[in-house]
Amino acid sequence: MRKKQKLPFDKLAIALMSTSILLNAQSDIKANTVTEDTPATEQAVEVPQQTAVSEEAPSSSSKETNPPQTPDDAEETVADKANDLAPQAPAKTADIPATSKETIRDLNDPSHVKTLQEKAGKGAGTVVAVIDAGFDKNHEAWRLTDKSKARYQSKEDLEKAKKDHGITYGEWVNDKVAYYHDYSKDGKTAVDQEHGTHVSGILSGNAPSETKEPYRLEGAMPEAQLLLMRVEIVNGLADYARNYAQAIRDAVNLGAKVINMSFGNAALAYANLPDETKKAFDYAKSKGVSIVTSAGNDSSFGGKTRLPLADHPDYGVVGTPAAADSTLTVASYSPDKQLTETATVKTADQQDKEMPVLSTNRFEPNKAYDYAYANRGTKEDDFKDVKGKIALIERGDIDFKDKIANAKKAGAVGVLIYDNQDKGFPIELPNVDQMPAAFISRKDGLLLKDNSKKTITFNATPKVLPTASGTKLSRFSSWGLTADGNIKPDIAAPGQDILSSVANNKYAKLSGTSMSAPLVAGIMGLLQKQYETQYPDMTPSERLDLAKKVLMSSATALYDEDEKAYFSPRQQGAGAVDAKKASAATMYVTDKDNTSSKVHLNNVSDKFEVTVTVHNKSDKPQELYYQATVQTDKVDGKHFALAPKALYETSWQKITIPANSSKQVTVPIDASRFSKDLLAQMKNGYFLEGFVRFKQDPTKEELMSIPYIGFRGDFGNLSALEKPIYDSKDGSSYYHEANSDAKDQLDGDGLQFYALKNNFTALTTESNPWTIIKAVKEGVENIEDIESSEITETIFAGTFAKQDDDSHYYIHRHANGKPYAAISPNGDGNRDYVQFQGTFLRNAKNLVAEVLDKEGDVVWTSEVTEQVVKNYNNDLASTLGSTRFEKTRWDGKDKDGKVVANGTYTYRVRYTPISSGAKEQHTDFDVIVDNTTPEAATSATFSAEDRRLTLASKPKTSQPVYRERIAYTYMDEDLPTTEYISPNEDGTFTLPEEAETMEGATVPLKMSDFTYVVEDMAGNITYTPVTNLLEGHSNKPEQDGSDQVPDKTPETKPEQDGSGQAPDKKPEAKPEQDGSGQAPDKKPETKPEKDSSGQTPGKTPQKGQPSRTLEKRSSKRALATKASARDQLPTTNDKDTNRLHLLKLVMTTFFFGLVAHIFKTKRQKETKK
């Protein structure tokens, strides 16, 4: 192994910086252990750990395939939360002075929970369970007002219940937290205590009146006892699902009436869950226990920065456990009013104007601050008037943290950033050196900018004020359908800027569907409690079924005022939960089979019918009016706008439902007049959906409604895989932006930031440099023991570098436009295999690769990959934009393990979408196999005067020549370093007299340092020492630098020629024709097609210029490890496991990329000297 060498200053600096970055990344990732509830698009995230970063990225996407949803969308993250998350002793609250006994819900109750509480109580005597990533189990909000009404009166009562059900674990914490257990079995203290604490507070928090907060936290069921169950990914998704399945069973057995699960895995299908988990859901349902889940914060296919393509309508990402039919899955919306911090300004007419603010490091309350306008805060001149004042800055152009840092540097005492979008959501700003900062709406920002009196005062007590966004679905809230093709989410609840408990007796606002779910869980618990008295003859499972249907039926369908249409049922479910309407309901509506309160029509034509059943539980006949809304997706260019498009509404009709009975209603829909235009925008089909709405009077408010969804087309058989990058007309894919100057440029992994870049459908292979091939042939078995400045790298089949520049690769094509994907499976590691990489647009199953010969017979079949998850995002926090499938690697051998004959083969990938009724699909690639060794020149002459080497003949190859070069190797410090010389225009080579090291030292070169290397486009390589060429003996053993024959040669292996085969092995029979239609025995006169750069592989732009490979010399080992790990990325989205794994790879790659940049820059400077 190579000894540790002394690093120059620049290398050392980069190494230290990269190590620091990597360690920070590892720390951050370990803290973020919750799965689906990742950073919300807007202000906060359900898992705010330690310190996060807020990045305001400027609107910059010029590629039509990858536009941001809105300008500057990528920065919506969470600000610093400086809470110490260590476990704390129970809080002492008696000495804290009382400031208010008014609850948060007293001020703002958009879901009307108080009305239901008045009827059903506040959960006394009830047990509720929260399954989450971690809790502060000693928070001050965990208390009961009257312990005598508790289900478990003592620890002994709990122990008896545990014993009755064989539960031997779990602890009694206090009267409120009757049970706590960590099901993760990792033996670690929960890093994230905040998320589960916040969720539990919304469900069942009951803060004391003596709290320091201005208003008291009271959850939906404040008097219920809590079962806190920690579950975290430790050993993969399957084990994770089994752990929370056990928690579900235990919660049911310990008497929970409702279970909240604010976590999950985006885009995963319910069908792929372990059987134990499915049985746990069924068990809870059979016992009448409601499971409420969050829909997730992954928005849609493409994440929060890309809009889904209009050609691919299966863009839903709701995953598990939310995809389970038995769960109630909750989306997030922002109500029109919110409890918020406020600031006051005096307007020109001397009126006080209050405005909502979202602060990081709050300003001193009740103090009048002067402020000055600072444009977008990008340049020094913007801040000329801010010293001693607050800087008022518009959002955009640069990161939030840079705006704040610039203002601080200019002497500002604080920062106010106002939105650059109307009706936007509030954004929590980053903590920059404890600088007071706040975010305000665009409307209020413009008011401040134009106000004559530049003074603002921040108020001490929060108030309820209208939101800038109005009532709107949260942009981060995950869309349905599920991967299985089912309707989710079911219902929506407030999830934007929700104030609740966090660790260490503190309270904070967080956003996400994790905040929406526990509110609905509490309402479900109370509604079932009401039904125990109202419907005593029902079984618990019957009451659960009724409560779910009533809650969905009584939800209010949310309307998008901007689009003049209802938000899609695939985004909001049945609508906004309304506890008051649910509690008072005597009617509800279901599908025609009374299965659920949503209608899934599957595939429909232009004309169809929606049939629903109206149920009347009252003792009187009920007269209602009904109509249906008809809508679809709005399309913006080539993308879904993630907004509704209204088509039309049916006329109001009247119906009477007898007492204690039900009646069906059928609504005919005719959308034929829209089909031509809609198919022009969405060629693969589109959703026709809406709500059947009921009123007691057409002029009054909606009483109840039911969502319906149909797909005009064949949803089950939509394409599951993005077309190969080779077929792209402009060189781009959904996640890949083409080089505008060379659309066929397709760089390999190399030293590039590949993890976020090389995401498309293609075949990968491996490029092995001559030095490594030579070392292996000389007996080095472990590639890690090879000393070389060159590396083995993963590239894409059909791509080739320039002869004198291997920093970029380009697709080379046959005359028919197909890529020249050729391999030579001779064991030298150079283009020996192909492996499938795909960007999946949908979940699929049973992926298998097979190879067919020219007769169509299958010669090889891979192992089956049973589950494939759509590549719904290109984000290290979730999943990459493509997946490499290790099982699909084909080494050019048949099913018996023998190398196939030379020729052209079809490499086929087969897979089936998991949607109901889907048929198998496949994608084909043509692959040339050719093991024919090139025939190189056997003699040459050398002119010492101009140092020109002239070969006696041109190389002869079966495939076109890829590169013909002279290699030379010298020692740079203790690393053998290889560089290449390309031929001059006349075919000669100019040999240098000396080489220059990285430190500027010169190294004399001897003739024995030079080797003639020829490589064809299938990866066959032959090489001959130049000394042998000059003597006219190509098979003479290579001599060392003393011009003496080495006295020892490898004894373990027979001598091999330049083809990588033993001398007694004859070349395989040549194929009749290659993919270009030319006979392979035609020699170099048959020139390959030019690539997109206008050059053929092998043509040299500069005369005799050595090619610089020094940028690779520092990373050979790291890259080998990186490529191997990248090829084995799992096909499931194990976020907790993958995030750390991916970031380690990326940060390592980033480090070597920086090193490469320094090397390359240095060499460029040397070349110019």
From Swiss-Prot:
Compositionally biased tracts (Polar residues): 48-67, 1093-1108
This protein's GO CC annotations: extracellular region; membrane
Xref: Pfam families: CHU_C, fn3_5, PA, Peptidase_S8, ScpA_C
Record propeptide residues: 1133-1169
GO biological-process terms attached to the record: proteolysis
Compositionally biased spans, kind Basic and acidic residues: 102-111, 1033-1056, 1063-1073, 1080-1092
Modifications made to the protein after synthesis: Cleaved by SpeB protease; leading to its degradation. Degradation by SpeB is probably strictly regulated to preserve integrity of C5a peptidase.
Keyword Magnesium among UniProt keywords: no
The keyword Signal is annotated on this UniProt entry: yes
Leader sequence residues: 1-31
Catalysis: reaction(s): The primary cleavage site is at 67-His-|-Lys-68 in human C5a with a minor secondary cleavage site at 58-Ala-|-Ser-59
GO molecular function, one term: serine-type endopeptidase activity
Domain named Peptidase S8: residues: 101-583
Stretches the record annotates as 4 X 17 AA tandem repeats: 1036-1103
Each Sequence repeat, start to end: 1036-1052, 1053-1069, 1070-1086, 1087-1103
Region named Disordered: 33-111, 1028-1135
Localization annotation: Secreted, Cell wall
Residues recorded as bearing Pentaglycyl murein peptidoglycan amidated threonine in the entry: 1132
Main location: secreted
Topology with respect to the bilayer: Peptidoglycan-anchor
EC nos: 3.4.21.110
Entry annotation: catalytic residues: 132, 195, 514
Motif LPXTG sorting signal per UniProt: ranges: 1129-1133
Family of the protein in this entry: Belongs to the peptidase S8 family.
Function noted in UniProt: This virulence factor of S.pyogenes specifically cleaves the human serum chemotaxin C5a at '68-Lys-|-Asp-69' bond near its C-terminus, destroying its ability to serve as a chemoattractant.
Protein known as: C5a peptidase
Organism: Streptococcus pyogenes serotype M3 (strain ATCC BAA-595 / MGAS315)
Gene name tied to this protein: scpA
